[in-house]
Amino acid sequence: MNEIRTIELGNTREFRDELNSLVLAGKKRATAGALEWDYEEGEPVERVGEKFALLDYKGKAIATIVATRVEIVDFIDVPDEFALAEGEGDLSAEDFRKSHAKYWAEDGFKVKDDSLIVLMYFEVL
């Protein structure tokens, strides 16, 4: 089977447009999510070499990305290297933790220092 999974970044049209623009410009080369979401959704953790269709707010594929590195770390241990690759905020791990704790809380997820986070680095094909 040659089907690829889809990936949607951001939870509003405006935020998704912003994040997708960063991906297409080569400034966003990573994304993160809570490991428990994969369990809740019955989805496997992303794996190196896996391809994803990047969707816009209408659900239309705008690019294909491939996972180049996948790590699972405690929220408190997300490194600056990842924050830089993610391309958001001031590009520091401290800003990553602050902004993502707020963003995820808005979606009902209260992140803790030991919450397991999947870090996926990727490139656009």
Task: Mark where each language-model region is.
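Mixed-charge, low-complexity intrinsically disordered regions
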Residues: 1-64, 68-125
